[in-house]
Amino acid sequence: MAGTQDQSQDYFSKPTTPSTPGQAHLGNVANRIPSTIPDRESGTERAKSTHSRHRVLHGLPSTFMSYMSRRPVASSRGFSRVSSEGTASRPTAPQHSSHFHHYAPAEDGYYQENPWFGEADKKPIFSLGKPLPHKVRRKVLKPVRPDGKVDEEMAIVKEETTNEPHPGYASRTTSGQPYRVETQSSLPSRDIQRQQSRTTAAGVAHNDRRNDAGQPVFEYIPGEATPTPGHRDPASRVQSKQDNGHSPPDFKVDGEPLGHQEKPCVESGDTNANEMRNWWARLRARHPEPLAEFLATAVAIFLGLTGTLSVNLSATQSQPYGTYETSCWAWGFAWMFGIYLGGGVSGAHMNPAISVSLSIFRGFPWRQCVIYVFVQFIASIVAGALAYAMYADSINHVDPDMTKMSMTFFSTPREWVTLKSAFFNQVVGSAIMMIAVFALGDDQNNPPGAGMHALVLGFLVTTLKFTLGYNIGSALNPASDFGPRVIAYAVGFRGDNVFHSGWWFYGPWAATLIGSLLGCTLYDGFVFVGSESPVNFRVDKRVKKLFN
């Protein structure tokens, strides 16, 4: 036997050339073979011999095999090896390469000092730098178990169906198979007592056997009772599901809308993650999203403003420092840098219209949305103040009366453009912006490759500035318009176009939000198929009664 294994190992390590075209794909097939197969009778997992796997792979080049040996196993990438029925199933390939991070090499001891490093995100990030996450937003009914507790696993989605089934049945949210939902009111008291007395910690009770006193007779079995999957009580199913790792640990930090999820060993107290952290590192680790959103928004608006100031301040010189197209490119690249800067932490929305639209149409938490909008406005004010401080001398030299350079800081319709035309211009531009944002974030459509979302969105901003910026300046971001407008008013710009005309509200605010919601509705109505969008919601009976 040992000689056979040695021969197999020697032959396996020899560099050979694939003899057929299909042999080059055998590595991917063998990599998806489960390493464990569950035993249906005992419910345990038995190891599968890797000898057959080696036999499938022999004949491949040694360089390819060394690459295959360094690849992470499927389970580390979120693959499911066992189906819900307990049978072995083929793992599914990852949907997008941008879902996985490529970390730089780390020295020995770095992971001990930084136990949070390399952990996968436990919370969905609504990022503009990758496809948007999918959330279940429908109401959930939680049936009551016979002992009066809520059965979390048996929770069903509340849906109004045209062909209503039997009142005691509903459809599973995972497998689509019907099952019986039993509540306290639907179970007779005798059935409740029978279910409660059916199983104990040390044995299994017969259903109908009773002694002279009418008490159930138990047949005790040494060790713990191992009921079959069909007769397992809901509590044991939930516990087993948690033990198998299908649900994250129930730590307090997981219930907070903002915060960083540490490793389980850190959350349980086995490892002190703050041992090497100062007070600021502890604060940042607990609330990274607002800080990242602030930095990304401030940098993007600052770069865009300074690019526009460079062009407008040099417009009267013999050699202008660029043209209007230069300003458009500056805003596009600035937005791209902002997404690269904070897209992996906060999502880098940098726009209140985007945050509100994601909350309405994709389930972005409203509490986070309020915090994001507040942070975005603070960042825009800081960016406007910093941009003015950089160019204060040039502004006072070119425009000592503080009248002409105001259009550099905020959106202003031209004198001959009517209010209706300016409002319509803003609505159309915002709608196109959100259609493109949702299209890039839809993994069921045609998302770009890894790391390309930021570049495409930067081109989008540049294109919108090119095409819709002549009439009003194309202020598609309430934050990037309001913050610099406040700074312009504070430093001495007192023209009617600052706050007196009212455009600051019904243009960058009202028109942008209306256009964004319109664009989201159009995309979800024509393209998006996910159930998280309210466009795809079923109308509740209470809403129907209002129109009947």
From Swiss-Prot:
The transmembrane residues are 291-311, 328-348, 370-390, 421-441, 449-469, 509-529
Task: Recall the GO molecular function terms of this protein's record.
Answer: glycerol channel activity; water channel activity
Motif NPA 1 is found at 351-353
Biased segments, Polar residues type = 1-22, 77-97, 171-200
Localization in the cell: Membrane
Q: Which residues form a coiled coil?
A: none
Q: Which PROSITE patterns match?
A: MIP (PS00221)
Q: Where is the composition biased (Basic and acidic residues)?
A: 38-48, 249-265
Membrane topology note: Multi-pass membrane protein
Q: Does the keyword Metal-binding apply?
A: no
Q: What does this protein do?
A: Probable water/glycerol channel that may have redundant functions with FgAQP2.
What name does UniProt use for this protein? Answer: Probable aquaglyceroporin-4
